[in-house]
């Protein structure tokens, strides 16, 4: 009959390797988190720059497009035509307001 011999050295060796592997994972997890944060910041920055460029492009396009002639005011045909056919539009232009400080 053969008897099995205990493998005490092998158990210690595998436990030691597991500890080294876990240490490596713990140490590299901080680097992985830092890399993910850096990538997120880079993506956010690229999206922000693209949005600013798009906004600038659209603003210049709106400012440079030719303005059409002003629509003529409809003449009142009868007493019941008080602008009910065409809704009134209100255009608001923001103006710099300067408040005096005392």
From Swiss-Prot:
Compositionally biased residues, Polar residues: 78-92
Gene Ontology CC annotations of this record: paranode region of axon; plasma membrane; Schmidt-Lanterman incisure
Record protein name field: Noncompact myelin-associated protein
Compartment(s) where it occurs, according to its Swiss-Prot or TrEMBL record: Cell membrane
Taxonomic path: Eukaryota, Metazoa, Chordata, Craniata, Vertebrata
Extracellular side: 1-30
GO MF terms, alphabetically ordered: structural constituent of myelin sheath
One BP annotation, GO: peripheral nervous system myelin formation
Gene of this entry: NCMAP
Keywords recorded for this protein, A-Z: Cell membrane, Glycoprotein, Membrane, Transmembrane, Transmembrane helix
Membrane-traversing stretches: 31-51
Post-translation changes: Glycosylated.
């Amino acid at each position: 009959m053969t008897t099995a011999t205990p493998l005490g050295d092998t158990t210690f060796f595998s436990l030691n390797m597991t500890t080294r592997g876990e240490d490596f994972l713990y140490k590299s997890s901080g680097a992985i988190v830092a890399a993910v944060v850096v990538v997120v910041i880079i993506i956010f920055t690229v999206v922000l720059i693209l949005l600013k460029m798009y906004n600038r492009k659209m603003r210049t396009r709106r400012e440079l497009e030719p303005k059409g002639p002003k629509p003529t005011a409809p003449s009142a045909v009868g007493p019941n035509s008080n602008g009910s056919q065409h809704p009134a539009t209100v255009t608001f232009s923001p103006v710099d307001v300067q408040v005096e400080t005392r």
